[in-house]
Amino acid sequence: MASLQQSRRLVTEIPGPASQALTHRRAAAVSSGVGVTLPVFVARAGGGIVEDVDGNRLIDLGSGIAVTTIGNSSPRVVDAVRTQVAEFTHTCFMVTPYEGYVAVAEQLNRITPGSGPKRSVLFNSGAEAVENAVKIARSYTGKPAVVAFDHAYHGRTNLTMALTAKSMPYKSGFGPFAPEIYRAPLSYPYRDGLLDKQLATNGELAAARAIGVIDKQVGANNLAALVIEPIQGEGGFIVPAEGFLPALLDWCRKNHVVFIADEVQTGFARTGAMFACEHEGPDGLEPDLICTAKGIADGLPLSAVTGRAEIMNAPHVGGLGGTFGGNPVACAAALATIATIESDGLIERARQIERLVTDRLTTLQAVDDRIGDVRGRGAMIAVELVKSGTTEPDAGLTERLATAAHAAGVIILTCGMFGNIIRLLPPLTIGDELLSEGLDIVCAILADL
């Protein structure tokens, strides 16, 4: 929204009276099982600003959890959606198909890693994409088992909860979960380095550790797929050691195991590449299947599985689909989103944001030992907070910092298995001045805590 002034403004306490009134209505109408990070109700948003119903303007360093990468209500998306809504809103691609779905599949086949023939299928959410990727892998290999990793998050359906590592709030009380799911150790350089310096820097060694666990737990002969986030999202923006992912991919290829890259949070320029797999090795990583969602359509519900044609074509006709998957309005938004990323130089913009944010945070880390680690890529940067003089996770400090930042008009998110990580996911359209102001506020609050 170009007309929305790009400056922070607080005219009430956070949350203000109008948001508080809506919070009471929410409590009477919405299941209490739905959590809320910051109880301000949004009136409009654009660029790097979210304006609430009280007229407060908050600096957005969350992008709706990495969704509005190109900014809320991006002009090309608004125009494309308006045009599509006026033409038709739904027919179901499985009943009477339409060009938009095909065009999105063509674009995904073009921009995802890998030069060979590819195919795509569209769904609504990241969890649907991951679940269907597992279906496709099982169909292709004829094998049942799936391996996920420590700290992983893959969704809230039954199967993707089984793949997810963290119990609260995602899994507790919702079992039993899908069988034939196994877990392997991730390369986590900061935490690995506390035990073994070699593990922190040698990705091949960390991969050998994981493969050893996989061989003992399940064995390649029973394994359909390995599912991994190239940079973990909810787990804490963990960037594995160099060589870890290529070694796993090589093992998968040698053992007829499908390598599934969950790029739901990392995809579409977020990490300073169109996809995070591109950062791995001299030529990038070419997964067998790649799952995308979040940033794909600037906030409209859309997800996809894209991959090698021979794998994607393995399921029988009618085995994949869904009533709303690849909705025409969401497809129009996705095409406009991809065009915006490519034409507006947003991949380079993510790299600029990385330099600005990491420079600021590492400078603070040098004088504050409660910052255990600063990590991430592009506009996907995390701060791991620990108790002073130790490496013990400090979830309490993290919560206090987030709460105080919200009260000061800055939207930040927390994550991690131990709840001790601040994650920064600004829209790529945020200006340097606004981004710097948000960082100033967060850093000043941390210094005072």
UniProtKB/Swiss-Prot annotation:
CDD domains referenced in this protein's UniProt entry, alphabetically: OAT_like
Pfam families found in the cross-reference section: Aminotran_3
SUPFAM superfamilies: PLP-dependent transferases
GO molecular function terms noted in the UniProt entry: (S)-3-amino-2-methylpropionate transaminase activity; 4-aminobutyrate:2-oxoglutarate transaminase activity; pyridoxal phosphate binding
Pathway annotation from the record: Amino-acid degradation; 4-aminobutanoate degradation
EC number, UniProt record: 2.6.1.19, 2.6.1.22
One of the protein's GO biological processes: gamma-aminobutyric acid catabolic process
Gene3D superfamilies for this protein: Aspartate Aminotransferase, domain 1 (3.90.1150.10), Type I PLP-dependent aspartate aminotransferase-like (Major domain) (3.40.640.10)
Cofactor section: pyridoxal 5'-phosphate
Catalysed reactions, semicolon-separated: 4-aminobutanoate + 2-oxoglutarate = succinate semialdehyde + L-glutamate; (S)-3-amino-2-methylpropanoate + 2-oxoglutarate = 2-methyl-3-oxopropanoate + L-glutamate
UniProt keyword annotations, A-Z: Aminotransferase, Pyridoxal phosphate, Transferase
PTM-bearing positions, type N6-(pyridoxal phosphate)lysine: 294
Secretion signal, residue range per the UniProt entry: none
Keyword Transferase in record: yes
Keyword Transferase attributed: yes
GO cellular component, one term: cytosol
Similarity annotation: Belongs to the class-III pyridoxal-phosphate-dependent aminotransferase family.
PANTHER family: AMINOTRANSFERASE CLASS III (PTHR11986)
Name of the protein in its database record: 4-aminobutyrate aminotransferase
Source organism: Mycobacterium tuberculosis (strain ATCC 25618 / H37Rv)
